[in-house]
Every structure is written in structure tokens, then in C-alpha cells.
């Protein structure tokens, strides 16, 4: 509820599928190649060419449908969506209108610790358009890169079930993690491989839904939050002023922090959909549908609940780990060894590892860290072989070099001194050299103990076992 108005949000999420070739031709499906280098007569829309559907696209879409609990339409067709734009050489896009590959479904998300179910209207397959290039060096004209033409997409259309920008963000993050878990989309928003259109309306409680506006050019999840919040405020201001919200398509300008009108919102009839005459009806055998369902891994929302219930993680930590394929695998591999509590691993994963990745821009795959090495490091710390400070030094090496924990400890001389006689000798020397602190402690100044332990650690060059060192000093102080 915002200023007495209920907010209604629906999202249309486009995900580029990471197949090797495009959806209707053999051109390479790869980002960042030379302009117009991955094109052919089919994806350029030349007269007389005939498309051939990439079977892998159907498989990927069905897997996403299973992940979102969708009905799978084993018999469906493809349609032409007619509109003119410079980056669409055929002047139509091959999509699905009446019967999508995946029908009704849902996804459960956690918002502030509470479970919310968001309905899925449909998932359909379609081809991407090209990309317009704008630059001052083009002397007042725009050029077209058709490399993206024919890149396979799935469009995931939600029900208008979200009631806040935060819910929308969590929904998008959940979709992203599922796509990555399935391995069907890399979800690199900076490359446009996942993007969304946002539909927003507001209404007074008890009244019918208001007129919605669609917002495009939303290129990050944080931009989606800002865009939704702005659009809600804009629509409320229009209604409070006695105006009428128009059904229109708007463009989000993240730099200006505002949405800008583009055109009146089209209805399906404006696109003059009709069946694609150059492609056969899609018929998927039930056996294949069942096989694809079996290939679905444990999904992040399921992992979150398992991490909370089985390992005692809080929701924030569980969500952070579960939504990253690589971090979740590292954590699960460590816990599978069943040696130490989860906290021993999450301290390193959510602390030093994430800090390193944020500072360097690297992913876990870019490091040399393995579950075996992390478990060995935790074992060394738990056995008091090295201190926590020494552990940080070892961890830093594990990130950069393929070495054993034991070798790093030996090379850097990080092994703690735990021999009682050696520690007692250090304690005797420190106590003799710090008579005032000894008297202070005996006189009731307990903070003097910390100073004495610190001096012992300094004398041992950090190698003394601090726990044992403290015990020995206490025994000697009486």
C-alpha cells in the first residue's frame, strides 16, 4: 500500500538461451563478436529463406517450464508478430501467441522471511531482434547490428501478483538463479541476456485494477526497483490531480530517474498475429517431457529451506549462498564431508571469499579454491594447528594458487606453537619483563591479562597458540 493505493505489478522477463546456434538457423549464438559477422540470409530476413527450429530451444524452454511448475503444452505452434522497426529485417518476429510451449505455473519466493507465491501466465519461445547502434561518429544516423537477430529467447510472463518493488526484485532474482541453475542462460544483464518489461498499475482498495503502463529499458534489478517506485508515484500523482492514467509504453531513463512516454500500449490485435506458415507444429512426446523433468537439479528456493532447516543458517545467508550456483556447490561439497558445523564454512564463504570477489571482480571459478582445500583449512584451525590470523594468510594463497593447506602452512611458518614447555618459557620471559602488568593483574586490573597475552604472542611472532598461552599465564599468575 502506497499513499492509500494498492500497487499491482506484473513482469515480462526475456532470457536469451545459451544454445550454440540461433533459433532458426546455424549462425553462431555468441555475444561480442564483430558487428554483422554472425548473420545469414535466414536471420537477415532475405526473401525465399526458410527457418528450421533449433530443437535445443524447445528442451530449454520445457526445463524452465518444469522449474516454474508450468503445464507443458506438448502440441503448440509458432506465430508471426507483425511490426516494423529498423532492427527487425523481416518486419515480423516469430513468437508464440495463442498456444505457448508452457502454460500456467507458479514460483515461490521469500520476501522478508515470508513465502509468497507468484503465478506464471506462460513461457513462450521467440527470436530476438537486432540492435541499433548510436554514435556521434555515425554523423547523425544510426546503424544496425544484426548479430542478435534470431538469438533464441524465452519470455516468462508473470501474473500481476506482485505488490511492491521489493517483491518484484526478489522475483527477478529468483528467476535469475533458476535460469543459472538450469544452465540455460548466463543472465549477464550488462550483455542483455536477461531483461524485463515492467507492467504497473495502482488502484484504491476494493476498486478494480487501474490502467497499467508498461516500462521498457529496465537493464538491472535495482533499476527495476527504482522504475517501479517512480511509476507508482507518478500514477498516484496523476490520479490525485484528477487525471487519468493512460495505457502506454514508457522508457525508463536510469540517469534521469524517470520514465519517458514512448507510444500508446499495443494490444495483441495491433500485432496482427497469425500462424507461422514456414514452420511445422511443435509436437513433443510425453516421454521426452518426463526425461527433461528428471534433469531439473535442486532449485535455489528449495536449497534455501534446506539450508535453514538442516544446517541452521539464517535466511539471509542461506539465500545468498543458494542463489549462486558456484557458492552453493562449494558449500554443499564442504558439508557433504560431514566434518564441521556449517558456521565453520559460511564464515569463510560469506566473509573473506565474497570480499575477495567483490574487490577483484572475479567469480569463484576464477579462483583456485576447492571444497577439499577449504575443509583442510577449517580442519587446521579447529585442530589449533594454525590461528585464525594464520588461516586468513592461508586462505589468501588458496584463492590464487593451487597448493595444499599443509604446504602453505609449512612454507610460511604459520604452524602454532602448542608445546607446553616452549610456551612456558615464553610466558616466564614476558612475566619477568612486565612486572608492573603482573602486579596490576594481581591488584584486580583484569585487562592487564590481555596485555600480557599480547606480549607473549608478540614474542612468539604470532606462532603461539593463544588459548594455551592464556591458560599458562593464568596458571603462573595464580
Q: Model-derived features: where do they sit?
A:
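Structural motif
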Residues: 3, 312, 336-345, 385-386, ...
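Amphipathic alpha-helical core segments of compact helical bundles
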Residues: 18, 233, 328, 350-358, ...
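Core structural elements
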Residues: 191-204, 309-332, 342-360, 372-374, ...
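Extended hydrophobic-aromatic, low-complexity segments
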Residues: 282-283, 318, 330-332, 344-345, ...
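Extended, non-catalytic structural segments that build the interaction scaffolds
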Residues: 288-295, 302, 332-340, 374-386
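Short, amphipathic C-terminal "tail helix"
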Residues: 446-478
Amino acid at each position: 500500500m502506497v499513499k492509500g493505493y494498492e500497487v499491482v505489478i506484473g513482469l515480462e522477463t526475456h532470457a536469451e538461451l545459451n544454445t550454440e546456434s540461433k533459433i532458426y538457423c546455424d549462425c553462431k549464438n555468441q555475444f561480442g563478436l564483430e558487428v554483422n559477422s554472425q548473420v545469414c540470409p535466414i536471420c537477415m530476413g532475405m526473401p525465399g529463406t526458410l527457418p528450421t527450429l533449433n530443437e535445443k530451444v524447445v528442451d530449454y524452454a520445457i526445463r524452465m517450464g518444469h522449474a516454474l511448475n508450468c503445464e507443458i503444452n506438448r502440441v503448440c505452434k509458432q506465430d508471426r508478430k507483425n511490426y516494423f522497426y529498423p532492427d527487425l529485417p523481416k518486419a515480423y518476429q516469430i513468437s508464440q501467441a495463442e498456444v505457448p510451449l508452457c502454460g500456467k505455473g507458479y514460483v515461490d519466493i521469500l520476501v522478508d522471511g515470508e513465502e509468497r507465491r507468484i503465478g506464471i501466465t506462460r513461457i513462450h519461445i521467440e527470436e530476438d531482434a537486432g540492435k541499433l547502434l548510436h554514435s556521434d561518429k555515425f554523423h547523425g544516423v544510426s546503424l544496425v547490428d544484426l548479430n542478435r537477430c534470431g538469438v533464441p529467447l524465452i519470455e516468462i510472463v508473470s501474473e500481476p501478483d506482485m505488490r511492491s518493488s521489493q517483491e518484484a526484485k526478489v522475483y527477478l532474482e529468483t528467476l535469475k538463479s533458476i535460469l543459472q541453475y538450469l544452465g540455460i542462460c548466463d543472465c549477464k544483464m550488462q550483455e542483455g541476456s536477461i531483461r524485463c518489461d515492467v507492467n504497473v498499475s495502482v488502484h484504491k482498495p476494493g476498486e478494480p485494477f487501474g490502467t497499467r503502463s508498461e516500462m521498457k529499458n529496465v537493464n538491472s534489478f535495482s533499476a527495476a526497483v527504482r522504475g517501479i517506485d517512480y511509476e507508482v508515484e507518478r500514477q498516484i500523482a496523476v490520479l490525485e490531480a484528477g487525471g487519468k492514467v493512460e495505457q502506454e509504453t514508457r522508457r525508463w531513463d536510469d540517469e534521469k530517474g524517470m520514465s519517458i512516454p514512448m507510444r500508446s500500449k499495443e494490444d495483441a490485435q495491433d500485432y496482427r498475429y497469425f500462424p507461422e506458415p514456414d514452420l511445422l507444429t511443435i509436437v513433443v512426446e510425453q516421454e521426452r517431457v518426463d526425461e527433461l523433468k528428471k534433469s531439473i537439479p535442486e532449485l535455489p528456493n528449495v536449497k534455501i529451506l534446506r539450508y535453514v532447516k538442516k544446517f541452521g543458517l539464517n535466511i539471509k545467508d542461506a539465500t545468498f549462498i543458494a542463489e549462486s550456483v558456484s557458492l552453493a556447490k562449494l558449500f554443499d561439497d564442504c558439508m557433504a564431508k560431514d566434518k564441521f558445523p556449517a558456521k565453520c564454512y559460511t564464515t569463510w564463504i560469506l566473509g573473506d571469499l565474497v570480499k575477495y570477489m567483490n574487490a577483484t571482480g572475479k567469480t569463484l571459478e576464477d579462483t583456485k579454491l576447492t571444497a577439499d582445500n577449504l575443509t583442510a583449512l577449517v580442519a587446521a584451525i579447529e585442530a589449533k594447528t594454525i590461528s585464525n590470523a594464520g588461516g586468513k594468510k592461508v586462505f589468501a594463497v588458496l584463492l590464487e594458487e593451487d597448493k595444499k593447506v599443509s604446504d602453505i602452512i609449512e612454507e610460511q611458518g604459520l604452524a602454532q606453537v602448542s608445546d607446553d614447555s616452549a610456551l612456558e618459557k615464553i610466558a616466564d620471559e614476558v612475566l619477568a619483563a612486565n612486572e608492573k602488568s603482573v602486579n596490576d593483574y594481581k591488584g584486580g586490573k583484569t585487562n592487564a591479562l590481555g596485555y600480557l597475552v599480547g606480549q607473549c604472542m608478540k614474542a612468539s611472532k604470532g606462532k603461539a597458540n593463544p588459548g594455551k598461552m592464556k591458560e599458562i599465564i593464568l596458571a603462573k599468575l595464580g
